[in-house]
Regions:
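N-terminal Rossmann-like NAD(P)+-binding domain of SDR-like oxidoreductases, especially those catalyzing
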Residues: 1-138
């Protein structure tokens, strides 16, 4: 969804030197596949919008899958971006990374200050880990 919107915007602005892959074309959970892609394409800019997402039922019944898959996607792409000298990486977070009862509007300093919404906690934790990995590489 977000990745498709980014692609549409780039095309509208007449950018032509880019490559996108669907999850069917590139499994971002596979570290070797991600590194092979980066070695072949040598991207300068990376937009990390990919994630395993679902509704409340899926989030509650497949908690380990959401955590594992999203951690793998994030760590593989962020590490490859670092390893292959990507100029800029845009990592998309989510409002669910903030505490369930956070005051609105959300502020960056609210991160990790209280409990997360239980139904999407694994997804949120993977997003937070991605943010912290980006901060660490920066």
């Amino acid at each position: 969804m977000v990745g498709s919107a980014i692609e549409r915007k780039l095309r509208q602005e007449w950018f032509t030197n880019f490559c996108f892959r669907t999850s069917a074309e590139l499994d971002l959970r596979n570290q070797k596949a991600v590194e092979d892609f980066f070695a072949l394409e040598e991207p300068e800019y990376v937009f990390l919008a990919a994630a395993k997402v679902g509704g409340i039922l899926a989030n509650n019944t497949s908690r380990a899958d959401f955590l594992y898959d999203n951690l793998a996607i994030n760590t593989n792409v962020i590490h490859a971006s670092y390893k292959f000298w990507v100029k800029k990486l845009l990592f998309l977070g989510s409002s669910c990374i903030y505490p369930k009862m956070a005051t609105q509007p959300l502020r960056e300093e609210y991160l990790l200050t209280w409990l997360l919404e239980q139904t999407n906690e694994p997804y949120a934790i993977a997003k937070i880990a991605g943010i912290k990995l980006c901060e660490s590489y920066r």
